[in-house]
Amino acid sequence: MNASFRYGRDLEVVQRLRPEPLTEREQAAQASVDDLDFEIFRHKMDMVALEGKETTMKLGASTAMRWGDVAFGIYTAQGDLAVCATGIYHHAVLSQIPVKYIVKHWRNEPSVGLHAGDAFFYNDPFYGGVHNADMGLSIPVFADGELVCFIGAAVHTGECGGSEPGGTVCGAKSRYDEGLLVPPIKIG
C-alpha cells in the first residue's frame, strides 16, 4: 500500500510554510562562507533554477506550460524553498508542502524510504497544490549517501480528467468531478 493513502492528509505539514530550523550542517556551512562567496553561490543557484524553468517550458505539452505557468525550485533536505525560478510564484512556494510531507512520512519509512533515483508525483490540492491542474514532481538529491536537497517542478496542465474540459471544474458537485487527484506518491 502506498504510504500517502495510509497516512492521509497531514494538516500539521500543510501549515508549515515557515522555514524549518537550520541543521548543524547548514549552520556550519553558513558560518564558513563569507558574503562574497555566498553571493556568487546564490547567483549560480539562481541560474540553475532559471535553466530548469526554461527547460520545463520547452518540454511542456500544455499551452500554459509553454507560456510560463511553471516553477522550478531547489529545496533543502527539510523541504524549505532555497531558490526558484517561476512564471507563477505560488507553485514554487506551495511545492514545499508536498516535499515536507515526503520528508516527514517517507524519509525513514522502511517500505518506501528516500533513495537516489526516486521521484515523487503529486497534484492533490489537499497536499499543498493550488488545484488539480497544477502537477508537481520532486526528486531527492544525495551526495555521498546523504540527502542534501530536493529539486522539483510544478506545472499547469490543461486537462486532468475532470467532468468539464479545461482542468478547472466550476460546477463540481464532488471531488470526483474534478478529475485526477493524486497525493504525493513515489513513481520512480
Role assignments for model-derived ranges:
Residues 64-67, 111-114, 130-132, 144, ...:
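Solvent-exposed alpha-helices and their adjacent loops that cap or buttress functional pockets
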Residues 74, 83-85, 112-115, 121-123, ...:
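General beta-strand structural signal in soluble alpha/beta enzymes
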Residues 90-125:
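A charged amphipathic helix-loop-strand protein-protein interaction module that recurs
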Residues 128-134, 159-161:
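Short, Lys/Arg- and Gly-enriched loop/turn segments at beta-strand edges
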Residues 134-144, 152:
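A short, hydrophobic, proline-anchored segment that marks a local hinge/packing element in signaling
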Residues 147-188:
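Mobile "lid/hinge" segments at catalytic clefts and subdomain interfaces of large enzymes
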